[in-house]
């Protein structure tokens, strides 16, 4: 038998836009991140105690064009602001269909005791992502604000995503899980028609 679980990536902390792999130190900066570190640690201890191979999938922002609320469209319609260029952060994304395939592969693939970043190859700042989505949906680009200005317009949860900047390395996902991204970046993911999931499609 095997064990697989989903986790987050916020416990990497703010890395100033640097590339981060699974061996990086965990520096949780929020209560939510601390809870995720605790949960991931518990999974690892349980699996090792019983000799069960496990994979912990570290998952960034999930999007899904075929599901309600699964894209930035509603944020654009609400004119939700983003940060000015000098303060902007790198974000990480994964299409829901690619995530489903990663989950499948983590359960049927080679035995492993590891964490795996499950993210695409987008390499985009948040404003670039939102600007591209605006072009796709033929909406206005989001307004830009400084960190001080934007605090009055966003929830604490939304603000927390703008306080950390990092780019996740996905080499382990491609080599250890063997996942070939169907949607390599959000450019394909937001514009292509979703295809039915089948386990044999890596």
Language-model features, listed with the residues they occupy:
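Glycine/proline-rich active-site loop of Rossmann-fold NAD(P)-dependent oxidoreductases
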Residues: 37, 50-52, 62-74, 79, ...
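Glycine-rich "substrate-gating" loop/helix at the edge of Rossmann-like oxidoreductase active sites
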Residues: 28-33, 60-66, 85-94
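Amphipathic terminal alpha-helices
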Residues: 184-202
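Active-site Tyr-X1-5-Lys
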Residues: 27-55
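Conserved Rossmann-fold NAD(P)-dependent oxidoreductase catalytic core, especially the SDR/UDP-sugar
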Residues: 1-31
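Conserved C-terminal active-site "lid" loop/helix of NAD(P)H-dependent oxidoreductases
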Residues: 131, 151-180
